[in-house]
Regions:
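Conserved NTP-donor binding/palm subdomain of two-metal-ion nucleotidyltransferases/polymerases, i.e.
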Residues: 1-7, 13-203
């Protein structure tokens, strides 16, 4: 983890605690959006601790298509409230989504940023490590991937995890071979754009 390329920190608090989170953070951060600004973005507001950017989310994600968004919010509400998994970070127990929802969420997050801004290899590694170390509820995963209409992107990314990063096919649910040409197009874009498009902005 010490060698992992850093990103920002996403903290999900939900709608009910959104304003309370802003109040609680004011005294411990170096920068924070004003109270009158926290609803400017439909998903989150921003704070900083030194140079580290923190996004405090009332919604984990918002889909552009209303029907898909309504469906996603139902899955997210369940995934962020039931069977939560505690992870200890620097002596603090942090609750993370259920393993079942997290499988989808890690993929959803990287796919969203791949389409909108760019990702680094670290996001692919995150998903590969998670799949390698967790038992995946394939019935639930198939339901959510199919319902959210992202089974093909899942399989495309999955083929890269297997063929480029060495994830076992047995650990990659719904693995199907994908053409090397398609894989190379995606890898080339990842390497050119970099983490959240940083490489393309630099060059």
């Amino acid at each position: 983890p010490q060698l992992r390329q850093c990103g920002d920190i996403d903290l999900y608090v939900g709608e009910a605690k959104y304003v309370l989170a802003h109040e609680a953070l004011k005294s411990v951060v170096t920068e924070i959006d004003g109270l009158d600004e926290i609803y400017n973005d439909p998903k989150h507001f921003h704070a900083k601790v030194g140079a580290v950017l923190i996004e405090i989310h009332r919604f984990a994600d918002i889909k552009e298509i209303p029907k898909l968004d309504a469906l996603y919010q139902k899955y997210a509400a369940d995934g962020f409230s039931r069977n939560l998994v505690p992870v200890e970070l620097c002596g603090v127990s942090v609750m993370t989504p259920s393993d079942d929802f997290n499988t989808y969420y890690i993929f959803n997050h990287l796919w969203h940023h791949f389409l909108s801004a760019g990702i680094g290899l670290r996001q692919l590694c995150d998903l590969a490590v998670f799949l390698d170390t967790h038992d995946v509820n394939k019935t639930y995963l198939e339901e959510i991937l199919t319902s959210m209409k992202v089974m093909k992107p899942w399989q495309t990314i999955g083929s890269i995890l297997v063929d480029y990063l060495g994830l076992s096919k047995d650990k990659m649910p719904f693995y199907v071979p994908v053409s090397r040409r398609k894989q190379e197009r995606i890898i080339r874009r990842i390497l050119l754009e970099g983490n959240f498009g940083h490489s393309s902005r630099m060059g």
